[in-house]
Amino acid sequence: LPVYELPGSSDLKRKITWPLWIAGGVSFRPVPRLLLSADVHWTQWSKLDRITTQYLESAWQTLVEMSRLDVRDLDWKDATQLRFGAEYTLNTSTALRAGYYHDPAPGPLSTLNVLFPSHTFNAVSIGIGKTISDLQLDFGLEYLIGNERTAWDPMPPISPGAMAGTYGMKIVVPTVSVSYKF
């Protein structure tokens, strides 16, 4: 029998429709040194209904089509984030900041996979801003605490490409910003 060797890799094309995102918020100063804010962010995750991959190497494309992994259904739903923040001005050159937001998972367990994880996050952030003449320095740290999600391996699979397992995610995001006023 002839043996066919599968190429070690293949270039690919992937079609992804990114969602519409709309946000709005309000802020006010209950006292001169304290700024409080609240935002609402709506994301149309339902636009990201599936991800289609086309492998340019024909052997890979055939293999992936046969396994039904060329199309990954996501079945994501629209989601709304709620965000709250505070900035306290210590003096004319220093501000302290803190925030919190809740970001619900847009995807169901039936389509959960490691390529596009979907977790509900509770995020907290802290920061400090320092003004030196016309130079503004800002430092921040954000910690996203993702919930743990367990996807089972249904027979038959609800969605090709779903990956059974328990997934958790925590993200730490440091930020630095330097700006200058002319």
Predicted region positions:
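Outer-membrane beta-barrel porins/channels
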Residues: 1-182
